[in-house]
């Protein structure tokens, strides 16, 4: 299979179950909603070394937010509900409550699983916090130096999927990075997905295990072009750079749509030679996304 002359390898991406919550961050302007959202999703690339996986899902207008102000939807993901509850508490408390004019609402109010995150955060008000109703939602008003912070009492969470992915093989680093950027921009239009790595792009693909017993994962030596003379690089001679796009999503359908949009965008960039995907022969996760099926 080819798209615009780019080979699509007959392989699959391997995803795994993850718990996730959507937070609707609002503020007086889109800029401040984005500032809060960026802080709240920082240090959230992989649960291998971060407290959570997190990213910006998309910007929303006042017609889509509980308080009618500009907003940003973010997704926060953890392997278990207990860790997710802690991540919500700390990320909202340290990154959104502290942001000028920001407020935080649940983006999954109808989810079966609910955390009383807002109630716990309300104690920051030192007894002066007040409970209120807004658009049928229970919220807490916490007094701050710059005005009240509004936070919804409960935040919903669902079973999502992490680890949807594809690999971009390119003639040079510039072409590969441009293709990766184009892919991330296309994925950004797909609701229910995030690309949690820096700018949505992974430069440091990894393999399971290492020569060092204390490491669970190490650099993907087979794809490191500087290791050709060491005899461990398996890349074709015309490939000089590989970038990976990792996608977390609320459903299989969302991840499949994001992969399709991203791959098609990447294949329009000159210098892209092949699209592949990372998997662990079905040993890591229960969700498989065959590239050719996703692109049909």
Map each language-model feature to its residues.
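Conserved mixed alpha/beta catalytic, RNA-binding, or beta-rich assembly cores of soluble enzyme
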Residues: 2-10, 14, 22-57, 74, ...
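Glycine-rich phosphate/pyrophosphate-binding loop regions near the starts of catalytic domains
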Residues: 62-71, 75
